[in-house]
Amino acid sequence: MRIKRWVCIALASMLLCGCSPLREKNDISSLLSLEPQNSLSYGEYEPYRATLYYIDPQRNTLSTELREIELVSSVPKGKQIFEELLSGPKERGLEGFGSEYTLKNIDITGGVANIYLLTEQNLSDQKKLALCAALSNTAVDNLGVQYANLFFNEEPAYIAGRPCGLLGKTDLDMASFYESYLEKAAEPVWSIPVALYFLDESKSYILPEVRTLSFEGENYLQEILYQLSLGPEYKHYLVSPLLPNYAFTYQGNFGSIGGDGLLSIDSLQKLFQNGSEQQMRQHMACLYHSFHGVVQGLRSMEFTRGMEKHTVTFSVSQLYLGEEVLLYFPSKDLKHLERFHHVVRSGRAHNLKTYLEELAEGPLKIEQTRALPCFPADMGSEGVLGAEMRDNIAVVNFSAEMLYSLEGMQQDELYLFLYAVVNTLCEDEAVWAVQFCFEGEIIDELGIFSLAMPLYPNIGLAQ
């Protein structure tokens, strides 16, 4: 949660109000402070100030260009930002990277942006590293990630014969950055941050944990497999795809990547617990995406079950990519809010509808020892009619049935419902406060709580 932003906006918050009859008089269009903008979920356009990085040839550093763009809600934000970046600078004195690039795809998962470019340009190592740094800096500043993994023509970026691995944000001049890279590349042991992919607790999605790995020679596959077998280091809610008693040796039954990009896994029973074909694919997806960020030439992985061979490609592996969202649910004693990370399919995070649907689903089974459902017992996501952004206010429109159910809640239940919604939606950096509406209209009060104005997050309720 972005504490500094919450501290600033908390000065403007209006939390509680005295008791008075409900009055459904204020149509939302009468709120002059809520200029219609666009919707994170349903609207068409959203004004956005993008921070784009280009080369300053005078200083040989990366410099920013702030550019006002209109984001189309139906197109992923990352795609639009990087297409703007690749279109070249508009400010004088900045240098772009050429026009022969096509942005193929961007996946955002677990704080990592996987950026895929197609190009026919034959870049020098120094120019490629500068482009990678510009892409990574742009991703960190605009997409809420900590790292970027860069791919050119479906291959992970290699410079000086070594994989770049994950890049964070750099403020070095490009000459020093390149020289530092070459010095490290000349050492016998090559250490880089790598995204290792594990299963989430539900075992429905895969998520990365970033870890610095050291490679000797080209033992990329073996070292990644060994690290996966150790399990996550700090994301303890993730699960290793490998058997806990897996004994790795460098002479493991692993095979090698063929000329057609096929990696054949021979000893499946020594790697994974026996499961359904789909579970095996999910486990293989962990391996595929972990290898894919470092190893060149990988196009598919094959495993055999019984007499049948099964293939996992990039497009299959991509289906299992997840993304974390932070949700708030009432505590069992109804005295505070409990925080939980849920995993949704990559691309569904930072969407008002997704947050509300997850709240309506309630806490997971393993969370129910600490938390209660947020929504009334007789109401699910059907109680949400819509949600949109107006300036930095999330306007959530509930049904009349939801209003009726909320009116039947006890005071502490209602209080925690309101702030479970507010705190959850305000986890998105674009949302500062939440305006509650019912059938398109603002009501003055619900119980003893004022809803005439937007509610700001309550940090003190969260534990």
What residues fall within each predicted segment?
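Bimodal "functional hotspot" detector
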Residues: 6-9, 15-463
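Positively charged n-region of N-terminal signal peptides that target proteins for export
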Residues: 1-5
